């Protein structure tokens, strides 16, 4: 268990541009990141082949690539980690969909293909991602709320703290964003 304030100190160093800080942070936050990844994967399709450990490792690699990570505290760090997980899962869905259509790969036996996304599941993941991108143009804060609540699993209060707004504002954005996304995704999937 990290000493009190240790994580905050490393987050501050990371925020200030210390590239080595992430290497010190990851072991301290690994268990929490695994819980977040497990929660993310639990909401995915049956037969998903991406493991919790793989997702956490991929998050680490992508965060390292970002060079300058802007996370002043835990909620902000986990919001960034959740957004990164979402991007990884969307990329994974795109890859699976491409593989199902051949993707320039050697054909595989049908029984091995069952582990991949169904066409509908891949379409749902991609429809959610596309809808979030459209919503970001209209209501950027609402997308941040969705990312914090849905992908990070943050509470209303934690989301409010991470975004520096009131819990009531988060609640309004959360309700409106969910309704808007539901409508958009339903329309996207009807085509």
Model regions: which residues?
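Σ70-family region 2.3-2.4 aromatic/basic alpha-helix that recognizes the −10 promoter
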Residues: 30-31, 53-61, 74-95
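Amphipathic alpha-helical segment used for protein-protein interaction
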Residues: 33, 83, 115-144
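Short, Lys/Arg-enriched C-terminal cap helix and immediately downstream tail that follows
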Residues: 37, 178-191
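Arg/Lys-rich amphipathic alpha helix in sigma70-family domain 2
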Residues: 39-42, 86-105
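Short amphipathic alpha helix immediately N-terminal
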Residues: 136-158
């Amino acid at each position: 268990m990290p000493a009190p304030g240790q994580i905050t100190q490393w987050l501050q160093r990371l925020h200030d541009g210390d590239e080595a800080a992430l290497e010190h942070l990851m072991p301290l936050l690994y268990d929490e990141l695994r819980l977040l990844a497990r929660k993310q994967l639990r909401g995915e399709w049956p037969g998903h082949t991406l493991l919790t450990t793989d997702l956490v490792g991929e998050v680490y690699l992508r965060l390292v690539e970002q060079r300058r990570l802007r996370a002043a505290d835990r909620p902000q760090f986990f919001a960034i980690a959740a957004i990164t997980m979402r991007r990884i899962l969307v990329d994974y869905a795109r890859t699976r969909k491409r593989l199902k259509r051949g993707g320039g790969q050697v054909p595989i036996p049908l029984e091995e293909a069952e582990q991949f996304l169904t066409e509908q599941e891949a379409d749902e993941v991609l429809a959610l991602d596309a809808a979030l991108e459209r919503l970001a143009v209209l209501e950027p804060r609402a997308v941040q709320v969705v990312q914090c609540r849905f992908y990070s699993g943050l509470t209303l209060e934690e989301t409010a703290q991470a975004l520096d707004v009131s819990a009531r504002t988060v609640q309004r954005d959360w309700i409106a964003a969910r309704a808007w996304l539901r409508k958009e995704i339903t329309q996207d999937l009807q085509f």
